[in-house]
Amino acid sequence: MNGGQAHQRFGMQIPKFQSQNHHPHHTQQPHHHTHHNQASHNINHQHQFSSGALASATPHFTPSHMQNGAHTNVDEDIDDSMNEHWQQQLQLAAESRQANSPHYHARSVAQQAKGIQIAPSQPDTQEQGSDGQNGVGKTKAVSRQGWHALDFGGQGLRALSTSLFNYVFLEKLYLNHNKLKSLPPTIGHLRKLSHLDLSGNDLTELPDEIGMLTNLRKLYLFDNNIRTLPYEMGYLYRLDTLGIEGNPLNDVLKSHIMKEGTKALIKYLKEEMPVHLPPPDRDWVVLDETASASTEKITVLSYNTLCDSSATQSHYGYAPARVLSWEFRRELILSELRSHGSDIVCLQEIDQGSYNEYFREQLAYNDYKGVYWPRGRAMGMQEEDAKGVDGCATFFKGSKFILLDKQLINFGQTAVRRPDAKGQDDIYNRLWQKDHIAVVVFLENRQTGSRFIVVNAHLYWDPAFKDVKLIQTAILMEEITKLSETYAKWPACTDKAAFRFSKEEGQTEAPPPEEPAPSVQYSSGDQIPLLMCGDLNSSPGSAAYNLIAHGRLDEEHPDLEKRLYGNLSKVGMTHPFKLKSAYGSIGELPFTNYTPDFKDILDYIWYSSNSLHVSALLGEVDKDYLQKVPGFPNYHFPSDHIALFAEFTVKGKKGKVVEADFGPQRN
């Protein structure tokens, strides 16, 4: 994206219907989109711009000729030129040419508000579909802005003020019948636009950033001089109508829209989109350089990989079919895991089949051992069906750590087993039905004797169930507290030798391994270093976040909505750990989940600050790269989430060292 390929377009020199290998394309499912009713307050807001080209525009400009001079040409070699798709093009183009007077659309809205009958325009298409399953919410934020449209039509504009692109709340923008020769790349800032009219200008091309406008339903380009379209228009998966008549568009693109309509052309551009240059590597942000060479360090990676069953065109319609294919994405995921070489890896949304048949085997070559549990729904399923159920997988370096214990926490099942669950309807009706889990492993460093509790969790996603996410978090912390007290009494490890292959004939004797230190015993559970990773589907400042960060939450918290969850909703929620978010050291990342409709922080690596200190972090994704990428997954990021990766130093141990009996020793 940062190199020459970023400006590559579909030029006329490319052969018609060039053949490329692609995975079968999934049928696109519509997403829900709400159109706001435009009232009379939308009119005459052009006075908001007091300087620049917008202010100097004259309201008396009327085009004296049609752009390009050939708005009715249809290539002779294209059949069915009068099918329904092209008939719509001609009809909309005719309507566009009649709208050449100044502020035509704003005046039409005003006339409608006064009850004056005007010629009807093409109705907006209302589509219904399912929301995505990842993220805190996909609903549009409530805006205090009273108007959402601007009409600069018929003004004779030759340039656009940069101030215009600060109006990110705009949903409709009319720039038709002016004298614009180019559209600034900053058009990509107006990501809420559903209607953009650029008809009747002198445009010869569109910027790649047009692909950022993924909410577009209508894009009118009638009567310009456009010969080709940027591949990035393939991101416009919601686009219903592309008005292109009156442009000398090249034959291949014109054939698609004439014969099959807008959707077919957008799909073609999406599937034929070249792989752009990758972004620069994410920076390794060093926070503490004071640690000595002898200081014990541990690295941890957390990653929601987006399971195969969730990576559908209905949820990720902007992504090419190949990008969504699991065979492609799993290779990228594996490559990233290997490149970081983290001591501990916590993966969410890994299905059973992928764990058993791919990741466990592949990561074994890199010294990893794994612990895995699927979500609760896998119980009772046929073996083949259960393979598609996702869960949480925790990997650790086998040469560095000993697995002392592993546990599954099923939030719903744990809740109904609580003594105070009787008569608490919300536990059964809201919480028990959700089968989200956490996986806990208890590890010991073979050489240093330090022990670690590692938690890998995935909470429920739906923003309408804030109470469920909060109670899942409370149960998680309650169960970790119980386990930590058990682990504080765990006996010393007596066998720390890592497996070693016997030397082959002719090989020199390897130096003997360093004598391992005895196991460290901890006086209480909250003294054991704790690392808690996962997709909590909760933003900073949410109830779930605050409970983890502050150690307590009041029973009257509004997220509980006065629902009944036993003692958790009667006396409140607490935990004894002093936890901090690793990325809180840099004010958190701009996002950990990135899609066209949602960009926020959902994923975390929490650590016990009394026993661990964060020393380095993997930084954010390059900002320039994101200017032309509306959402993940794509060819460089295989999930809608990004990986978190942190390095910690182990603080001085507050427990006492327990000498383990290693048996007879050689002198």
Swiss-Prot record:
Keywords, ordered alphabetically: Activator, Cytoplasm, Exonuclease, Hydrolase, Leucine-rich repeat, Magnesium, Metal-binding, Nuclease, Nucleus, Repeat, Repressor, RNA-binding, Transcription, Transcription regulation
Signal peptide limits: none
Cofactor(s) the protein requires to work: Mg(2+)
Catalytic activity: Exonucleolytic cleavage of poly(A) to 5'-AMP
Biased composition (Basic residues): 22-38
Region (Disordered): 18-40, 55-140, 502-522
Top EC class, one word: hydrolase
Binding site for Mg(2+): 349
UniProt-listed GO biological process terms: DNA replication; DNA replication checkpoint signaling; nuclear-transcribed mRNA poly(A) tail shortening; positive regulation of transcription elongation by RNA polymerase II; transcription elongation by RNA polymerase II; traversing start control point of mitotic cell cycle
First-listed, main subcellular location of the protein, grouped into a coarse class: cytoplasm
Subcellular location: Cytoplasm; Nucleus
GO molecular function, one term: metal ion binding
Gene3D superfamilies in the cross-refs: Endonuclease/exonuclease/phosphatase, Ribonuclease Inhibitor
Family assignment from sequence similarity: Belongs to the CCR4/nocturin family.
Name this protein carries in UniProt: CCR4-Not complex 3'-5'-exoribonuclease subunit Ccr4
Gene: ccr4
